[in-house]
């Protein structure tokens, strides 16, 4: 039974890009046993890895319209590769998942978030651990909007992968609970960044009582 649960847990953590529903393949397995269904639903929705706009929209429909109670199980959300993500779908998804403790976004989903009202509202997802991957595209004015969101009021740990020059920009955010920032610098970017820039960024964060750690082990 334990092995069965571990296998199902692994299955539901991944989203098939060709599927029109995040956990489409899971339901046939769970339908075998009602007891198994009730035990695995919280596991199935604990961590959601969304890799397409369709997956986000389908999940939003499930959590907002079909089964709102499932939203209480969601503790982690990762959204990537959603260039054409509808802002309203993302907004409704974030407003429904009030118990999220960690979140991961790439550039595309971060830009989509800037087009919604979700980050500015008092209700909705408020993660404690936040991870951003800014290596897949460029951010311009969106960054100023992004770091000012009320959504980040509870963030204690921030993990960023991308251009070190963005570190100083992010230091201007509110970040009332933030204690540490770990910045993963791709080796391809290290040769173009001076140590002076990195030292200045560390000082900016240090002045706020926040620790910034550079990590250039990322490839």
Q: Where are the language model's segments positioned?
A:
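Leucine-rich solenoid repeat modules
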Residues: 9, 152-219
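Hydrophobic beta-strand segments of well-ordered beta-sheets in folded domains
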Residues: 7, 46-48, 72-78, 99-103, ...
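Concave beta-strand-loop units of leucine-rich repeat
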Residues: 78-84, 104-111, 130-139, 159-165, ...
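Leucine-rich repeat
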Residues: 37-42, 59-72, 89-99, 113-126, ...
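Low-complexity, intrinsically disordered/propeptide-like segments
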Residues: 6, 11, 124, 137, ...
